[in-house]
Structures are given as C-alpha cells and as structure tokens.
A protein has these predicted regions:
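Boundary/linker segments of alpha-helical solenoid repeat arrays
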Residues: 62-64, 92-105, 161-173, 235-263
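Alpha-helical linker/edge segments of TPR/alpha-solenoid repeat scaffolds
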Residues: 76-84, 106-134, 177-223, 251-283, ...
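Bacterial signal peptide processing site
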Residues: 21-24
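C-terminal motif of bacterial Sec signal peptides marking the signal peptidase cleavage site
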Residues: 17-19
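Alpha-helical segment of the N-proximal tetratricopeptide repeat
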Residues: 29-57, 68, 217
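C-terminal soluble interaction/assembly domains
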Residues: 359, 374-419
Length: 419
C-alpha cells in the first residue's frame, strides 16, 4: 500500500509541476477535438452565433482559444470581438517566440507531459496557422477601412511564409527533383518567382490565398511592383488558378515586363485586354467548408509478464480521417454559373503539418510508455497490487492524443473567374 501512496504523491507532483496553463480535467482525461466538438459542429452547420456562444478560450488556451474565437467572431460578423481575440493570440505568440531560453516551468511541463500526455505541453501553432492569423487580422483591418494596417499584416504573413519555405528548402528541392525526373513541365510561376517547382508539396507549405490577397492589397494601394511580386508567388503555388493567372498577366502588362509577359502568354495564351477608366474588376474569394478536425486513434493492450502481473499499455495518436470533400454550389453572376479554381487547400496544409510532426509525436509516445512502465514495474516488484492497479487505471484514463489545431479555418479557398 505504501507504493500506492507514493504513486499518488508522484502523480500530484507531476500535476503541480505541469503548471496551470494547460492543466485541466479536459486535458487530463479528454482531448481538444472532443472538448471542441459542439463548437466545431455549429461552425460546420453555419450557426456562427451559436458557435460564438459555445466557444471558450479556456479550452484551447491563450493562443489556440483566441484563434478559434477570432475566426468564429469574424464569421459571425462580430468584427470588434474578432480583432480583439486575434490581437490577444498575436501577443501570446510573440511572447512565446521571444523566449530566448527554455524556462524551468516549461521543462517541468515537458516532464509532466511525459508522465501524462502531450496536451500538457504549451501549444505551438503551425506555420500555416500563423499565416492565417495575420490574414484574418488583415481582413479585420480592411473592415475598418484601414488599408495600411492590412498591409502591415500581409507583410508579417509573408515573413512567416518565407521562414516556412526556407525551413523546408531541402524537402522542396527534393520534390522538385522528383517532378523533373518524372518529366513534368516546369512551373512558370516558380521560374518567375525564383521558387522551387515542388508541385503539391509547395502548396502544402505555402498559402496561395495569402499571396494573392497580399497582391490585391498592394494593387489597391497603387504599389503594382509589390503586387506583381506576390502575384508571381501565388502563381508558383497555384499555377492553374485562372484568377491568379489573369492578375499576374495584367500586372506584367501594366508594368511593361515584356519578357515575363511573353513567357506568360506562351504558357497561358493572350493576356486579357486592359480595363478602360469606366470599368473595374470584381474579385471574388470563396472560402468553402471547414478544415478537418484531428481525431484520436487509441488502443489499449493488456499484457502479462511471467509472474502473472498485468499491465495495460495505452497508445494514443492524432490522425485526420479520410473523408471526401463536400461539394458547394458554383458562384453565379447574372444567373450564369462561374467556374472556379482552387487558391488554397487548407486540409492539405493541415495534413502536411501532422506528417512533419508525426515522428516526434511517436518518439514521445514511446518514451512515455517506457517511463510509465518503469513506475508500474516498481509497483509490481514490491508486490503492491493496489499501486499496480492504480497505475493501470491512471494510464488508461490519461493517455490522450494531442488533437489541437485551428479547427474553424476553411477547408479550401476558391476564386470564381470570368476572363
């Protein structure tokens, strides 16, 4: 029985060491997707006002909780609340990024997560999520007619994109080499933007929506040179998007980029004629669906040793379920349906992020199983059946997958077009 008391004391120490930020009954005995399910389903159903009422930043923490709150409030057209929440998450991200060294509390939290589950770790937003943070901050500034504020955010978003690309330069170059070996024709956008021609791998790392919106905002501010830079980047990411092609060719023609325009026309056909002073362009950006939420895969394995001592080894990992993308009605103009092209596939970005993290997740899972087993064996060795039983129950209840991600983002973004 003494070891049972010691085990209880060890568990108590782990919980206290983990700190208050991520410690909750939900994080101990459940996971984020389960806790956020009502909110997620309300957003999927388009019931944004209800989702806004249900959402609580306590579930996701200061960063992720405010990501969700900012996005839901934006969908509900509650722009002041959206801006406030996204600014709060932005400040929290800056604090996280500005830490020069690992603090004692962070080390304790990491130790706690190895004894419990990864939900006790501080949430580290993915690169694509940081890009969307600045995108929606920028759109909120546009709602206030603050073009300069929106431009500041797209510049920050572009810095995130550049850092993400450089961090994966080796993988992108490898993907580019594979495409060349398969005889795939060169992506002209990649050539013009000096980007790796990495096909779907590039679009899972770089956000065409961000680049295109950035180009539009620069064009609105009469900075066509900067707009052309981002249009070319968007073309590198989404080389078949008709709206991106049109905007890139329009900017090249307006700027007198003759060689670029020649290459563009050779690849895509004649550039569209310019607009006269009485005409304007209407750009439609269509956010569709809701990004997939991570789900938990779990298995409990009862195993007995030579002495007949039983143990339950629990494994829990996050995964994205394979579901077909829902179909949405085409945008219509004057009763005529407009064909649309994909500008961003957020599900692909989310899946790529999980793929990149999965090795680390599995390693931590293996270490956690080993650490928990050492405690269990100590209990079994000293003949403390109560301690052994308590540990098995604790292990089974607390082994939860880390399913945290920004779950209210769109599934994909499209641009209806009419050339």
């Amino acid at each position: 029985m003494k070891l049972g008391v010691k085990l209880f004391g060890l568990i108590s120490w782990v919980l206290m060491a983990s700190g208050c930020a991520n410690l909750s009954a939900g994080n101990l005995f459940s996971h984020y997707s389960d806790q956020n399910q009502e909110v997620y389903q309300a957003v999927v159903a388009g019931n944004y006002a209800n989702a806004e009422q249900l959402q609580s930043s306590d579930v996701g923490g200061e960063i992720l909780g405010n990501f969700e709150k900012g996005r839901i409030s934006f969908l509900a057209k509650d722009y002041p609340t959206s801006l406030k929440a996204l600014e709060e998450s932005d400040r929290a991200v800056r604090v996280q990024q500005d830490r020069a060294t690992i603090s004692v509390s962070e080390t304790a939290t990491s130790v706690g997560s190895l004894a419990v589950n990864d939900n006790l770790n501080e949430y580290q937003p993915a690169d694509y999520e940081l890009g969307f943070l600045h995108l929606y901050l920028g759109l909120n500034y546009l709602q206030k007619n603050d073009l300069e504020g929106a431009l500041v955010e797209v510049r920050r978003a572009n810095q995130v994109q550049e850092a993400a690309r450089k961090a994966r330069e080796k993988e992108l170059k490898s993907a580019e080499k594979d495409l060349k070996n398969q005889g795939m024709s060169a992506n002209l956008g990649s050539v013009l933007a000096s980007y790796p021609d990495a096909g779907k791998k590039l679009s899972a790392v770089q956000n065409g929506y961000l680049f295109y919106l950035s180009g539009l905002l620069y064009e609105a501010s009469r900075d066509l040179n900067s707009a052309y830079v981002d249009y070319r980047r968007a073309l590198a990411v989404m080389p078949d998007n008709k709206q991106v092609i049109e905007s890139t060719m329009y900017a090249a023609k307006k700027l007198g980029m003759r060689e670029d325009l020649r290459l563009l026309e050779k690849r895509y056909g004649k550039a569209p004629t310019g607009l006269n002073k009485s005409q304007g362009r209407v750009i439609v950006i269509d956010e569709q669906g809701v990004v997939e939420a991570l789900q938990g895969w779990r298995i409990d394995l009862p195993i007995f040793d030579s002495r007949g001592n039983g143990a339950i080894y629990s494994l829990a990992l996050p995964y994205y379920p394979k579901r077909g993308a829902p179909r949405f009605s085409d945008v219509a103009l004057n009763g005529t349906k407009l064909p649309s092209s994909t500008l961003a596939d957020v599900n692909a970005m989310a899946q790529n992020d999980l793929n990149e993290r999965l090795t680390t997740i599995v390693i931590r899972q293996a270490i956690r199983v080993w650490a928990k087993d050492r405690i269990r064996k100590e209990a079994a060795k000293k003949g403390d059946d109560v301690g052994n039983i308590l540990f098995n129950v604790w292990n089974t209840l607390t082994e939860q997958p880390d399913t945290r991600s920004w779950q209210t983002l769109p599934a994909q973004v499209k641009t209806p077009h009419k050339l």
